[in-house]
Amino acid sequence: SRACYLAGSIRLTRSAVVQAAEPLTMPAVSDRKRPEGVCFQFPEDLAEIEQAHKHAIRFSDRNLPRRSRRKGREFTGCRPDGEHHTLADVREGRCSVFHLVADMDTENLERLVCGFGKEPSAVPGALGASAAIERYGIPAVQIAGGAQGLRLLRDIPDEETGEIVRRQCATVFPAPAQLACSFDQEVVRAVGRAVGLEMAELGVQLWLGPDTGIMRSPQEARFAEKWSEDPVVCGTMTAALAGGAWPYGTAVLHAQSLPEAVSVSQSALRDVYGLPFEIAADGCRAAKLPDCAISGQRLTENSPLLRAWLLDCGYGGMLWGDETLRSDRIGLEKAAIRILKWMLQAKKL
């Protein structure tokens, strides 16, 4: 007997746009092409097709609105109003975030965007921090890592004597793969809430938690930092963790195990590798872009692939580029707007 069964087929009477896909340089997949133009069938498949129940699938609910398919007006920069502004003015409603960004000079924009996460952290053992720009009232953001909770320095010595003067204790939670084995989003959300409370207590605002990418092999170097080999499980668990931590801190949507350059098909990118990020995009307020090239397009260079992902997922949170390249004034302003909007929403800032 066969080990597989005919699931069904889809016939479209008119076009439907369900994903904002962009053309990519696809690798050749010869085994998926058949000269006869039909898929392989067993002799009894035709009888099963005739007897199968017909079910109509409506794509209208998933069809993207026409306004999202059109390319909007090109961003030409923020227009200043001739006055000096701070982040407190934006928070109190005296000006918009666009006026603040327009008032900032290029040097401070580079400190905020290009130097994000590269400053020494005030929390011992943390990964880093963003620059504190006092002129515009922009505070420093403390960033910590750790797939099983906050990875910080427990014993803090005195700089002169070397003696332990105080301790900061962070809880070590089960590994992401163990939490994912429960298939319980409430459990993962509770873990995120507990980590968020520790973030508020220890002065951390951004947490690079478990890797959102799929677990391709148990022999991976970052096996202990990932959820599962299933993209749906990875996405739902990441969203639950970020949702639990959000009232107190921000869990960053990120993937640290991608190679420097990879070539994948559009279907594999959308349905396997990119699906966890699409699922988790609604629950995450910050995302760290990997400095890698996917089918010749770098995500950190405002590529068509990145713009399509932002449009398809409807993601409007902060984007943090994992690279040191400098950008022009327009690019710096676009990145600074996302960072400042996140700061206005984040707690303890």
Would you name each region that the model predicts?
Residues 1-4, 9-349:
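Glycoside hydrolase catalytic-domain context in secreted enzymes
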